[in-house]
């Protein structure tokens, strides 16, 4: 048998650590889980665990992301109206609550307490929730284009469902869970006064003519499929504190790829993958893909795509975008309003250099 390469050995060890950690978290919960026991389960050393994951929380997020991305998806009829779609989405959500799982502790029951305990995770999680609301709202609008902006309805639905999740953990058995489904259905008739305002930021994109050579073909977190970035459209490089800005580009009518970047990829990239995967699991049951927004979401853990777009460094406050046409970058902008400016703005007559300290 041929010897494994160093990369193959590391990948195998990582998979063993993830499997061992999932068993440990399922049996003991996050707080009582021990890295030493995880190492023993994986038949590796404690150092081998830490060579793959910087800490127990990063490992926990990675386990949850892996589980969410590989969760089987039942075949259901998607909703044909906003009310139906919200109902199907809510039913798919509540079917995954801790009381419906076979794990003794429920793998995800400690997620929100761990996120809430640290500003490092709270701010990105808030923007990940905003991204979820944008995607769900745009998908609902695809079901009924005459309904107007539905992002606030999506926010209300996600608030209701996350509240139900928290109570299912803290007070199991409280309330009738299918009343939560009916409450979400009723949100279709809620007048939230939601309107899409004109962008107040007058950022002018720069005219450029540069090759666009993305180094990898990442995975679209919304579909789980490869996302080649060779077509025309907007590539928005967004730190995890700026994710809601992607709506500006999508509203402009462009094909948009949101490239998620962070200064803490080992911990926050799995959290991003988890959050989008959980939305995807319910969205694919509730809304036909033909109604989904023209948006792809990819995670740029090592910054390779950001560098290809002209950003040698990117962090959680980054907001930058490029417009690609026929394999060339034709305009770009950075800072607040970059997504909107690049998607709809008239190019400026000079090159605007990247400023990696702008936000």
Regions from the PLM with identified roles:
Residues 16, 24-58, 62:
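Helix-turn-helix
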Residues 186-191, 309-325, 330-359:
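Thiol-/selenol-based redox modules, centered on thioredoxin-like
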Residues 126, 145-188, 195:
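Hydrophobic/aromatic-rich alpha-helical bundle segments in the mid-to-C-terminal region
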Residues 119-144:
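Amphipathic alpha-helical packing segments from all-alpha helical-bundle domains
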